[in-house]
Curated annotation (Swiss-Prot):
It is a peripheral membrane protein. The modification N-acetylserine is found at S2. It comes from Pichia angusta (Yeast). This is ATP synthase subunit d, mitochondrial. F-type ATP synthases have 2 components, the catalytic core F(1) and the membrane-embedded component F(0), linked together by a central stalk and a peripheral stalk. The central stalk, also called rotor shaft, is often seen as part of F(1). The peripheral stalk is seen as part of F(0). F(0) contains the membrane channel next to the rotor. F-type ATP synthases form dimers but each monomer functions independently in ATP generation. Keywords: Acetylation, ATP synthesis, CF(0), Hydrogen ion transport, Ion transport, Membrane, Mitochondrion, Mitochondrion inner membrane, Transport. Its main location: mitochondrion. InterPro entries: ATP_synth_F0_dsu_mt (IPR008689), ATP_synth_F0_dsu_sf_mt (IPR036228).
């Protein structure tokens, strides 16, 4: 990891990411899971760095009768070189996570923008609407042409009562 990436990773404030970006659902859960794994890896690395790595072979040679085995272990330790781990699989997982997170973020952005546009139109309609008591039948028919069709259909069939009206508002007939 480059020094710039390490510096950025250390400065990253995980608590603000979800709230500032407005993430929710699967994206927020995946980010939280990634943060937990990152914190656990940092903790384990810190603990391992704190452990002493030097072995006092002179102490073991003076304590044990079989110094040949201590010499063998000492030579094996001096020859030991840590193996390089293949991180390509983990890096590919991180890249796929980033790609999926970016895709989810773009989807969320498009949904939010569409919703905002609809809400702005609705607000504009509400602000420009006339008061209810100033509406005419022609205004209602212009806004909802299906209302005129329903009324004409009911009149042609001889129905002059709106279905469900009595159940909802009661019957005002006294006799």
């Amino acid at each position: 990891m480059s020094s710039v990436a390490k510096s950025t990773a250390n400065k990253l404030d995980w608590t603000k990411i979800v709230s500032k970006l407005g993430l929710s659902g699967q994206t927020a859960a995946a980010l939280t899971s990634f943060k937990k794994r990152n914190d656990e890896a940092k903790r384990i690395l810190f603990e391992l760095k704190q452990q002493p790595s030097n072995v006092d072979f002179a102490f073991y040679k003076s304590t044990l009768k079989n110094t040949a085995i201590v010499d063998k272990i000492q030579s094996d330790v001096s020859k030991f070189t840590p193996s390089k781990a293949n991180l390509s699989k983990q890096l590919n997982l991180i890249e796929s996570f980033e790609a999926k997170a970016l895709e989810n973020a773009k989807e969320t952005e498009s949904v939010v923008l569409a919703e905002l546009t609809d809400l702005e139109k609705t607000l504009e309609n509400i602000e420009s609407a006339r008061p209810f008591d100033q509406l005419t039948v022609d205004d209602v028919v212009k806004a909802r042409p299906d209302v005129e069709e329903k009324v004409q259909d009911m009149v042609s069939k001889g129905r002059f009562e709106v279905p469900g009206y009595k159940e909802k508002f009661g019957d005002l007939v006294i006799m």
